[in-house]
Curated annotation (Swiss-Prot):
The gene is rplT. GO terms for cellular component: ribonucleoprotein complex; ribosome. Binds directly to 23S ribosomal RNA and is necessary for the in vitro assembly process of the 50S ribosomal subunit. It is not involved in the protein synthesizing functions of that subunit. It comes from the Bacteria. The lineage of its organism: Bacteria, Pseudomonadati, Thermodesulfobacteriota, Desulfuromonadia, Geobacterales. GO terms for biological process: ribosomal large subunit assembly; translation. Belongs to the bacterial ribosomal protein bL20 family. GO terms for molecular function: rRNA binding; structural constituent of ribosome. HAMAP family: Ribosomal_bL20. The keyword Hydrolase does not apply. This is Large ribosomal subunit protein bL20. Keywords: Ribonucleoprotein, Ribosomal protein, RNA-binding, rRNA-binding. InterPro entries: Ribosomal_bL20 (IPR005813), RIBOSOMAL_L20_CS (IPR049946), Ribosomal_protein_bL20_C (IPR035566).
Amino acid sequence: MPRVKRGFKARQRRNKVLKLAKGYRGARSKLFRSATEAVDRALNYAFRDRRVKKRDFRALWITRINAAARINGLSYSKLIHGLKLANVEIDRKVMADLAVSDPNGFAAIAAAAKAKF
C-alpha cells in the first residue's frame, strides 16, 4: 500500500484556518495550533453573541419605551397591558423608535393605552 502524506489537503485545511485568523495579534495569526484555538473560540463567541444580541436589543427597546411611557404618566407594564386591551398590535422595536423619533406619535399610543386601562 502506498504511503499517503496528505500534503495538499493538509495545507488547504491549515490555510483555511490561518485565513480566518488573519488580523489576530502575534502567534495567533501565524502558527496553526494557536490560530486553531483562537478561531474556535472566536466562532463560539460569534455563535453565542448572535443570540445575546437579540436579548440586548429587546432590553434596550423596553428601557426606551419605559422612559417614554413614564413621561406620559404610565409605567411600561401598564402601557403594554393597556395596548393589549385596546387591541393595538405594535411591536417593541417600532414603539421604541417612535419614542425616540416621534414623541407626539408615542403620546397618542400612550393615550390609547390609558383610555382602555
